[in-house]
Amino acid sequence: MRGGSLWQLGQSITRRLAQSDKKVVSRRYFASEADLKKTALYDFHVAHGGKMVPFAGWSMPIQYKDSIMDSTVNCRENGSLFDVAHMCGLSLKGKDCVPFLETLVVADVAGLAPGTGSLTVFTNEKGGAIDDSVITKVTDEHIYLVVNAGCRDKDLAHIEEHMKAFKSKGGDVSWHIHDERSLLALQGPLAAPVLQHLTKEDLSKLYFGNFQILDINGSTCFLTRTGYTGEDGFEISVPDEHAVDLAKAILEKSEGKVRLTGLGARDSLRLEAGLCLYGNDMEQHISPVEAGLTWAIGKRRRAEGGFLGADVILQQLKDGPTIRRVGFFSSGPPARSHSEVHDESGNKIGEITSGGFSPNLKKNIAMGYVKSGQHKTGTKVKILVRGKPYEGSITKMPFVATKYYKPT
């Protein structure tokens, strides 16, 4: 596909992200063009042809000169460099930082070895998801975590409220929000070999989910082997004043194969990887069990509870949820958020939460929720797009096999 079809695809994704952003902003805070925050790489994006759009109160590149489709494919074939500094990195410190965090998330934080991490979910009293987050135990008295841009204000207020209560009972915990640092995501098969050129540390011993503080390109960085694409890769927390130099060095060392990539391709990549987007696929009324994130609930936490909404979540683990997140293949136009899912008799059984055309599979994919009992792989469904039903089927996720770097 070339020319007009690709342009239409890009415009469709652009509109979808912009509409999603408007929904998020209207719920959480309003920002005019003049109020939009800019990352340390803003001028760098503009100089490289970045198309800047409002996203969660920030001016962020949705794409560059490459089409969204080409950028998505290039990430899986070579590599992509994303600016994700709109997300919020923070550190919790103190001898009680681990038990404090365990009151708010479902992960077995105490069971993590220093230098390792995991995806987790912040929950509310009803068992719903406040946000998902990648957390890392740097040491037994230092936790580093990253929360979503659109949830920043809500998450920080939530953490602060519970921290005050925890400290009032004698708990030793403090926090620091890393507003002085940028966050870059280097993803794809060339991520490790390119980054290895910029550090003396042996990255072959740093596996998926591992964390290290090290020198990269002459700057002290927080490096986590993780990402939002399903590919091998890294998230690099770098001081703001060194962010542009690091981005330039990564692009130069790749000899043009790793390309700057925007939010449009990032959305396609995470959808292909079957990963949730908070605000679409996860919300405050959806539990980790319903979202298919049971694996993120630590075994010890299932036995002991101790986090907000534990009674609801542990009951769902016992009885099973009433709805389940599943993947879909569909015919016709790509299904979008809020498209209804019907069974073959025309009864509504669920709803799409994310969908689009997969540049790597060359077919429509989507994820959403259906009633338990209707979630089996291979189940035939009808997906309504602009009121018209199209053939679809339920499938397992991820749609594209993940390539996380793990010990053999």
UniProtKB/Swiss-Prot annotation:
Protein name per Swiss-Prot or TrEMBL: Aminomethyltransferase, mitochondrial
PANTHER family: AMINOMETHYLTRANSFERASE, AMINOMETHYLTRANSFERASE, MITOCHONDRIAL
UniProt family annotation: Belongs to the GcvT family.
UniProt source species: Arabidopsis thaliana (Mouse-ear cress)
Binding site for substrate: 235, 266, 404
A single GO cellular-component term on record: cytosolic ribosome
An example molecular function term from Gene Ontology annotations: mRNA binding
Gene name in the database record: GDCST
Localization annotation: Mitochondrion
Function: The glycine decarboxylase (GDC) or glycine cleavage system catalyzes the degradation of glycine.
Keyword line: Aminotransferase, Mitochondrion, Transferase, Transit peptide
Subunit details: The glycine cleavage system is composed of four proteins: P, T, L and H.
